[in-house]
Curated annotation (Swiss-Prot):
Residues 1-29 are extracellular. This is Type III endosome membrane protein TEMP. PANTHER family: LEUCINE-RICH REPEAT-CONTAINING PROTEIN 19 LRRC19 FAMILY MEMBER, TYPE III ENDOSOME MEMBRANE PROTEIN TEMP. The gene is C1orf210. The chain crosses the membrane at residues 30-50. It is a single-pass type III membrane protein.
Length: 113
C-alpha cells in the first residue's frame, strides 16, 4: 500500500451518538404509530358505546326478541282442564308421600363399616 491511501482520523473527527440521525426503520416512528393505534382504539370503542346508547341497531336487535305467537281462533291448542290440586309445584315421585318417617332411630343401625 502506498502512503497516499492511508489517512489518519483524529478523535475530533469521529461521529458522536448525538450527531448520528436515526434511520427510518428505527424507533423514531414508534411513538406516532403507538399513539395512533391507541387513539384509534379509543375512538372505535366510543363509537360502539354511542351506537349502543342511541339504539342505532334496534331494528336488527328486534328480530332476536322471542315472543309467543299471537293466538288465533283456529288451529290453536285445545284447552286442557287444570287439576284441582295444581299448586304450581312439580311433584317429586322419588319420595312417595306417607312412606317412612324422618325420625326413625333404627335406620342408623343398619349400616356398619
Amino acid at each position: 500500500m502506498n502512503e497516499t491511501n492511508k489517512t489518519l482520523v483524529g478523535p475530533s473527527e469521529l461521529p458522536t451518538a448525538s450527531a448520528v440521525a436515526p434511520g427510518p426503520g428505527t424507533g423514531a416512528r414508534a411513538w406516532p404509530v403507538l399513539v395512533g393505534f391507541v387513539l384509534g382504539a379509543v375512538v372505535l370503542s366510543l363509537l360502539i358505546a354511542l351506537a349502543a346508547k342511541c339504539h342505532l341497531c334496534r331494528r336488527y336487535h328486534a328480530s332476536y326478541r322471542h315472543r309467543p305467537l299471537p293466538e288465533t281462533g283456529r288451529g290453536g291448542r285445545p284447552q286442557v282442564a287444570e287439576d284441582e290440586d295444581d299448586d304450581g309445584f312439580i311433584e317429586d315421585n322419588y319420595i312417595q308421600p306417607g312412606t317412612g318417617e324422618l325420625g326413625t332411630e333404627g335406620s342408623r343401625d343398619h349400616f356398619s363399616l
